[in-house]
A protein has these predicted regions:
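Amphipathic alpha-helical scaffolding segments comprising HEAT/armadillo-like alpha-solenoid repeats
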Residues: 31-43, 65-82, 105-127, 139-148, ...
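Bacterial N-terminal signal peptides that target proteins for export
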Residues: 1-9
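N-terminal leader/linker segments that initiate helical-solenoid repeat arrays
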Residues: 23-65, 91
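Conserved hydrophobic register position within alpha-solenoid helical repeats
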Residues: 56, 96, 128, 160-163, ...
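Residue-level detector of extended alpha-helical repeat arrays and alpha-solenoid scaffolds
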Residues: 53, 89, 93, 109, ...
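Short inter-helical turns and helix N-cap capping residues of alpha-solenoid HEAT/ARM repeat scaffolds
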Residues: 48-49, 80, 88-89, 119-121, ...
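Alpha-solenoid repeat junctions
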Residues: 60-64, 100, 104, 167-172, ...
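Bacterial N-terminal signal peptides
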Residues: 10-19
Length: 305
């Protein structure tokens, strides 16, 4: 027994002083070169350059490790004591929120809630920006926005919307579910839209009980199609909501048509294909057309057993 204890002690001692391993509370032994990577990203997140912070967030997002989650949370929080610091820029919070959704760690829930509450209180109903040809979120995996111009123009509204969507992808808690539902009646239309996205992403049918009533009172077209998309996407029934989504494919606003196309994919109904095919035949907005074609392929694939 004594020899066994001595062996274990020597093994632990040798492990602790190993020149190539460092102990970490979350992951145990971490190679020094790997720890150096995370230390470097910590340094970059603490910098005053939003582009450098964003790049550090991206690097931490795509590594198979939980070590970077708290650093991304730190980027989300920024520097509260220095409100004018570039570390608090909306673009940093936007990408930090998106990264936390991809990491999927529950320790991000409370920080996301706190930051969302703090930033969403000061938002107005709508930002009056001149629309440009390049309106719309870039990238096939992004949810559209009616006033997204480019990375330099990411607003706090967009950042708060991303926080809500990320909360929807994480396990719902009593507090997060309450906040998401409350956001459905927020004064800003994009926040209401993002709350609807979050409800859909959460995937819980029991959370849609009040959506029909909220839908009936919604006046903004973009928020309305987002709420309708969440409702129809969770129901997945060929009912009046399906018909309403199909009708929205004819809307004059290309952003609304794009959201309607996304809604049809969510419904997972092959009978949506002819309607989308007809919409594609007359669509003249290239971004919307690309989205519709991609959505049409997905709907067609539903027929394959």
């Amino acid at each position: 027994m004594k020899s066994l204890v001595k062996y274990i002690f020597i093994s632990i001692l040798g492990f602790a002083v190993s020149p190539v391993l460092v102990l970490n509370a979350d992951e145990g032994a971490v190679p020094k070169e790997r720890l150096a990577f995370f230390t470097e990203q910590q340094r970059r997140i603490a910098s005053a350059d939003p582009d450098e912070i964003k790049d550090a967030i991206d690097r931490l997002t795509y590594v198979k490790s939980k070590l970077g989650v708290r650093d991304i949370i730190a980027a989300l929080r920024g520097t509260p004591n220095f409100p004018s610091s570039t570390q608090n820029s909306p673009v940093v919070k936007f990408y930090a929120a998106k990264a936390l959704g991809r990491k999927g760690d529950v320790i991000a829930i409370d920080p996301l809630l706190a930051e969302y509450k703090k930033q969403s209180e000061i938002l107005v109903e709508r930002e009056n920006k001149t629309r440009k040809i390049k309106d719309g979120v870039y990238g096939s995996d992004s949810l559209s926005s009616p006033y997204f111009f480019g990375e330099d123009d990411i607003s706090m509204v967009l950042a708060c919307g991303e926080m809500l969507r990320t909360l929807g992808t994480l396990p719902l808690t009593e507090n997060s579910e309450k906040e998401i539902k409350q956001a459905l009646i927020h004064k800003n239309f994009y926040i209401r839209s993002s709350a609807a996205d979050a409800i859909y992403l959460a995937g819980k049918k029991e959370t849609i009980s009040n959506l029909p009533e909220i839908l009936s009172h919604e006046k903004d077209a973009y928020a309305k199609i987002s709420i309708l998309s969440a409702l129809a996407g969770l129901e997945r029934l060929p009912n009046q909501n399906f018909k309403a989504v199909v009708d929205t494919l004819k809307d004059e606003d290309p952003e609304i048509r794009k959201k309607a196309s996304e809604a049809l994919v969510r419904m997972d109904l092959t009978l949506a294909a002819p309607h989308l095919e007809k919409a594609i035949s007359i669509e003249n907005d290239q971004r919307v057309l690309a989205q519709m074609r991609e959505d049409y392929k997905q709907i067609q694939s539903f027929r394959v057993p």
